[in-house]
Curated annotation (Swiss-Prot):
One of its GO terms (molecular function) is unfolded protein binding. Belongs to the GroES chaperonin family. Keywords: Chaperone, Cytoplasm. GO terms for cellular component: cytoplasm. Gene3D superfamilies: GroES chaperonin (2.30.33.40). Coiled coil: none annotated. This is Co-chaperonin GroES. It is found in: Cytoplasm. Its main location: cytoplasm.
Amino acid sequence: MAAVSLSVSTVKPLGDRVFVKVSESEEKTAGGILLPDTAKEKPQVGEVVQVGPGKRNDDGSRQAPEVGVGDNVLYSKYAGTDIKLGSDEYVLLSEKDILAVVN
């Protein structure tokens, strides 16, 4: 079996799934103390980089996703599947796990 090379352009979400690049977590506290990786909270904000075709309705048609590529979104803390590509962190979410689009 040949090895598969993963990149953002090769990941195509299915159904109502959304591929999000996770925003960087804070390195320092407000007082200037550096945080070790174990003390950092998991970020809940990221930028949408790929969107699936949408959820299938009962009649077989597709419901268009409410988010699009480039949107910044707030998502549930423990939602999705974490994926690391190179040095960047991503999460593959179901659209229902997205709480809001943020500007």
